[in-house]
Amino acid sequence: KITSKFGPRRRRMHNGIDVKVYIGDTIRSAFSGKVRVVKNQGRRVGYGKYVIIRHENGLETVYAHLSKQLVKEDQYVEAGEVIGLGGNTGRSTGSHLHFETRFLGQAINPALLFDFEKQDIVADSYLFMKGKNRYRRNNSSYASANGDVQYYKVRKGDSLSRISQKT
């Protein structure tokens, strides 16, 4: 169950979502990847105990407020592998998992990538462009929230320069 959504919150931006978990619940990696950060910001400060994983496609996922981290930095983890236990560490008002997704340092609303009720991904592939987030489900056409999708069929003799001028 989502207890707090992505977006502006009081005086600052909430760059992830909060998922209800109980202390000691198993937390698993969303995708395969390399553990980049395993840290503890301390009691009542920031994320508390947290893990950041960089996935092969460049996406990073953040798992915060853990009671225990079960991975080490530079460790490779598979999708679904246990990485920690749910908790209430750091700046937290109850047990929950703070979950963030980032691409090239930019926070992305996890609800655009995951359907938390169905426990599935939203799309089979994603295309991230400056100012635009697009996704594709089951090889259908790309969808965009602002409807500005453009297509271009590459023809013999086309160069990247020519294509960029036409799109």
Predicted regions: what they are:
Residues 2, 27, 33-35, 74-86:
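A structural signal for short beta-strand/turn segments enriched in small hydrophobics and glycine
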Residues 21, 30, 71-72, 77, ...:
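Surface-exposed strand-loop junctions at beta-sheet edges and helix termini
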Residues 10, 134-167:
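Primarily a LysM-type cell-wall glycan-binding module
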Residues 29-73, 95-100:
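Zn2+-dependent peptidoglycan hydrolase active-site motif and core
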Residues 38-40, 82, 87-88, 165:
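Short, surface-exposed secondary-structure boundary micro-motifs
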Residues 3-29:
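Short glycine/threonine/proline-enriched tight-turn/helix- or strand-capping micro-motif at secondary-structure
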Residues 1, 111, 121-144, 156:
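Non-catalytic extracellular/periplasmic "stalk"
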Residues 46-54, 75-131:
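Conserved, short, structured surface segments that act as functional micro-motifs
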